[in-house]
């Protein structure tokens, strides 16, 4: 009997493509992870270094900002000081200029002051001479008690009591009109110097014009004051040391005549 024939075969198992990829991935993954672990250490150092640099930069920027702020403040203080000094200098120059102008003005006014003093001396001399001349003729026997002059005007006081019309006639007898008071200064002057009596003056009520009028029908700086007195249109006005007032023209009072001088005595 013959021996059976034995046949040998080699069985080869082929890995599937998915399994091959998995094996290959595992084979390659191992070395990469090792490489990553080796490379991560230098990067961490770099990141830390960059963080430190950023921190230093922030600190530097903060310090610079503080320095710039302090510099600006210091600069502003210096500018304010300079401006204050400049303003003080301007004020000092202006003060010096005004002082110089006042000095020059006072120098310029000296001739005017000297002129005014001269005029006053001459006026006083003229007043004294005029009063002396007129006083020497005061006793005329016609009722003139006294007279005197002030500035460019002479005043005649007739001390015979009469009506306003009689006063006007007596003044005309001396070729001097009944007194017209030019302004409030003259009024105050007369009230200081007259004897305490009542005196007719040249102001009466014009019934035709229905207004108060002076003897020459001219204006006076006293008109406004008279209008404020609200006279009652009773006829005529008299003067006393205390007031001027309207009253019946037929009441007898003393009389004041007044005239401006045309020529100064030498």
From Swiss-Prot:
Cytoplasmic side: 1-48
PROSITE patterns referenced in this protein's UniProt entry, alphabetically: C_TYPE_LECTIN_2 (PS50041)
Protein localization: Membrane
Major site of localization recorded for this protein: membrane
Any one GO MF annotation of this record: carbohydrate binding
Outcome (variant: residue 2 to N): In strain: C57BL/6 and C57BL/6 X BALB/c
Result, substituting residue 151 to G: In strain: C57BL/6, C57BL/6 X BALB/c and NZB
Its biological purpose: Receptor on natural killer (NK) cells for class I MHC.
Name by which UniProt lists this protein: Killer cell lectin-like receptor 3
Organism of this sequence: Mus musculus (Mouse)
Origin organism lineage: Eukaryota, Metazoa, Chordata, Craniata, Vertebrata
Gene transcribed to yield this protein: Klra3
């Amino acid at each position: 009997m013959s021996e059976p024939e034995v046949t040998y075969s080699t069985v080869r198992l082929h890995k599937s493509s998915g399994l091959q990829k998995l094996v290959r991935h595992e084979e390659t993954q191992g070395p990469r992870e090792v490489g990553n672990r080796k490379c991560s250490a230098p990067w961490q150092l770099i990141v830390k270094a960059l963080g430190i640099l950023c921190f230093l930069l922030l600190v530097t920027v903060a310090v610079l900002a503080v320095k710039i702020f302090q510099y600006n403040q210091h600069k502003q203080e210096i500018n304010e000081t300079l401006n204050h000094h400049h303003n003080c200098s301007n004020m000092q120059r202006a003060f010096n200029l005004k002082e110089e102008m006042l000095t020059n003005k006072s120098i310029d006014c000296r001739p005017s002051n000297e002129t005014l003093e001269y005029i006053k001396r001459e006026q006083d001399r003229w007043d004294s001479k005029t009063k002396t001349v007129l006083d020497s003729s005061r006793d005329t026997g016609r009722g003139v008690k006294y007279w005197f002059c002030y500035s460019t005007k002479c005043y005649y006081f007739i001390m015979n009591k009469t009506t306003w019309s009689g006063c006007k006639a007596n003044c005309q007898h001396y070729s001097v009109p009944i007194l017209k008071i030019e302004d409030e200064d003259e009024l105050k002057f007369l009230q200081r110097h007259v004897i305490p009596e009542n005196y007719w003056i040249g102001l009466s009520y014009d019934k035709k014009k229905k207004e108060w009028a002076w003897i020459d029908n001219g204006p006076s700086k006293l008109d406004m004051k008279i209008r404020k007195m609200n006279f009652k249109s009773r006829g005529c006005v008299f003067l006393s040391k205390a007031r001027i007032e309207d009253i019946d023209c037929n009441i007898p009072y003393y009389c004041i005549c007044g005239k401006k001088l045309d020529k100064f005595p030498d």
